[in-house]
Amino acid sequence: MADQRQRSLSTSGESLYHVLGLDKNATSDDIKKSYRKLALKYHPDKNPDNPEAADKFKEINNAHAILTDATKRNIYDKYGSLGLYVAEQFGEENVNTYFVLSSWWAKALFIFCGLLTCCYCCCCLCCCFNCCCGKCKPKAPEGEETEFYVSPEDLEAQLQSDEREAADTPIVIQPASATETTQLTADSHPSYHTDGFN
């Protein structure tokens, strides 16, 4: 069995119909009738001494499972067993995308764009490295502060000095408790009175 050639994936989408003895435009009722007839004929309980019948029964079950599922049947009719393999690997919703991206014109477009942008170096320089490592970076508008780099050591020193300054002044006021009726804007002043004390 190990020396047998692995079955290749078809793109025509007809072999499952041949397993059930049907043509490609068969209805779901035709598929059910043919499946029942062939399943009874090749069932392993009716053919205990015939291992070929068990293999044939597995093929019939597989064909029935695929052809009765509307989504899988549609994929099989369009792309064959290769489409079913792609659906299993990438999901049924991504089959069309896979075949579009693996078409000759999509590959040609990818190669053309690669040649046009010097193997995508222009895209890499402009997007990843901010136009030549920041040398061609657009200037910040007037009035806005420019960002600058702060080293981790300077940041640590700033945090420590803030902690020392905060340690010198004690906290003397408790924060106000918040409820569902607490105002979130600074315009309105909170009221600490209940309805009975108006």
Swiss-Prot record:
Modified-residue entries (Phosphotyrosine), positions: Y17
Pfam families documented for this protein: DnaJ
Residue numbers bearing the Phosphoserine modification: S8, S10, S12, S15, S151
InterPro entries named in the record: DnaJ_C_subfamily_member5, DnaJ_domain, DnaJ_domain_CS, J_dom_sf
Membrane topology: Lipid-anchor
Protein's cellular compartments: Cytoplasm, Cytosol; Membrane; Cytoplasmic vesicle, Secretory vesicle, Chromaffin granule membrane; Melanosome
A biological process term (GO) from this entry: negative regulation of neuron apoptotic process
Motif position, Required for binding to Hsc70: 43-45
The J domain, residue ranges: 13-82
Keyword match Chloroplast: no
PROSITE patterns: DNAJ_1, DNAJ_2
Post-translational modifications reported in the UniProt record: Ser-10 phosphorylation induces an order-to-disorder transition triggering the interaction with Lys-58. This conformational switch modulates DNAJC5's cellular functions by reducing binding to syntaxin and synaptogamin without altering HSC70 interactions. Palmitoylated. Could be palmitoylated by DHHC3, DHHC7, DHHC15 and DHHC17. Palmitoylation occurs probably in the cysteine-rich domain and regulates DNAJC5 membrane attachment.
Tree of life domain: Eukaryota
Main location (coarse class): cytoplasm
Stored SUPFAM superfamilies: Chaperone J-domain
GO cellular component: chromaffin granule membrane; cytosol; intracellular membrane-bounded organelle; melanosome; membrane; neuromuscular junction; plasma membrane; presynapse
Keyword annotations from UniProtKB, A to Z: Acetylation, Cell membrane, Chaperone, Cytoplasm, Cytoplasmic vesicle, Lipoprotein, Membrane, Palmitate, Phosphoprotein
In-chain residues carrying the UniProt-annotated modification N6-acetyllysine: K56
Subunit structure as annotated in this protein's UniProt entry: Homodimer. Interacts with the chaperone complex consisting of HSC70 and SGTA. Interacts with ZDHHC13 (via ANK repeats). Interacts with ZDHHC17 (via ANK repeats). Interacts with HSC70. Interacts with SYT1, SYT5 and SYT7, and with SYT9, forming a complex with SNAP25.
Known function: Acts as a general chaperone in regulated exocytosis. Acts as a co-chaperone for the SNARE protein SNAP-25. Involved in the calcium-mediated control of a late stage of exocytosis. May have an important role in presynaptic function. May be involved in calcium-dependent neurotransmitter release at nerve endings.
Protein name according to UniProt: DnaJ homolog subfamily C member 5
Gene: DNAJC5
